[in-house]
């Protein structure tokens, strides 16, 4: 019987159990907590085997649930992406540009005050040179297009060589992470009080077919729905920096991508009712603007354990 079987010691035995369960055959469907045991077995296999050659009888059940949870992200829907300006690079260049633009008024006041004309001419020539500097022109162009924070390229996903492992992507895979709400996008980068943050607004260039993994802890589930609910919970779980905790979500994400979808959405683990988006091809979205913000404070929620 299943309850007396050595825990995952015989993979063929467990695969048979899963197949029998999927086919609805007695006695496996009658065993208490059978879905939980099958799901734990699935996670055990995924963590202990080479996931690039991973085969498991539960995979077709998982893939079949994707189309049932299809979500169409409409073209031009507002999404938000935040980046931390740790070195104050963007803030400093914006401030320097503001200083450059204010210098003509200062020079004019010097001229009216009888300031040495030779020195004044040198200052005016220097200002003209700075105005025509390629870096100044770049910043002006960026600001004119509505990008106070990072420019359009900087608002998208990082280059593959800089992409570190995340909830949905393995190292070197560049997905675009965004959020439905501005404050969710900020919370997801976990900034410190006093940080300056670039917040971008992005729009999908076309309607995108996503898999909805939004987690509802109060949902009533039964049968095969249990496995999809567990997947949703994996995406909504708080991660404390352990990369191994991302193996499940990274694998499910790869299943979604290779099933032909453009991305997925799931509940934020940091913001109640916040929604995150992952777009597999960053070029499917375009940044339309960005702004620089200062993190003033963070509000914590907590509850007391009762004995």
Each PLM stretch: what is its role?
Residues 179-183, 246:
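Conserved structured core elements
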Residues 1-172, 191-307:
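Active-site and NAD+-binding cores of ADP-ribose-processing enzymes
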Residues 173-178:
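A short, exposed loop/beta-hairpin motif centered on an aromatic-Gly-Thr core
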């Amino acid at each position: 019987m299943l309850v007396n079987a050595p825990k995952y010691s015989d993979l063929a035995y467990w695969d048979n159990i899963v197949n029998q369960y999927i086919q609805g055959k007695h006695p496996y469907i009658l065993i208490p907590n059978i879905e939980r045991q099958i799901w734990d077995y699935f996670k055990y296999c995924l963590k202990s085997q080479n996931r690039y050659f991973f085969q498991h009888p539960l995979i077709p059940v998982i893939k079949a649930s994707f189309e049932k949870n299809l979500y169409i992200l409409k073209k031009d829907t507002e999404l938000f992406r935040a980046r931390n300006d740790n070195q104050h690079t963007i803030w400093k260049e914006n401030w320097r540009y503001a200083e450059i633009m204010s210098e003509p008024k200062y020079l004019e006041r010097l001229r009216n005050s009888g300031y040495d004309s030779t020195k004044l001419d040198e200052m005016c020539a220097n200002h003209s040179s700075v105005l025509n500097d390629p870096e100044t022109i770049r910043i002006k162009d960026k600001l004119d297009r509505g990008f106070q924070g990072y420019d359009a390229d900087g608002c998208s996903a990082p280059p593959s060589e800089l992409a570190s492992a995340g909830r949905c992507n393995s190292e070197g895979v560049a997905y675009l992470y965004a959020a439905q709400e501005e404050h969710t996008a900020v919370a997801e980068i976990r900034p410190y009080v006093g940080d300056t943050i670039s917040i971008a607004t992005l729009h999908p260039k076309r309607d995108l077919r996503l898999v909805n993994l939004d987690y509802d802890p109060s949902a009533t589930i039964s049968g095969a729905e249990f496995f999809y609910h567990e997947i949703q919970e994996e995406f909504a779980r708080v991660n404390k920096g352990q990369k191994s905790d991302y193996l499940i979500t990274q694998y499910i994400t790869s299943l979604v991508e290779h099933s032909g979808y453009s991305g997925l959405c799931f509940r934020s683990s940091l913001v109640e009712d916040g929604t995150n988006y992952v777009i597999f091809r960053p070029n499917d979205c375009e940044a339309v603007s960005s702004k620089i913000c200062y993190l003033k404070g963070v509000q914590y929620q907590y509850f007391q354990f009762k004995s």
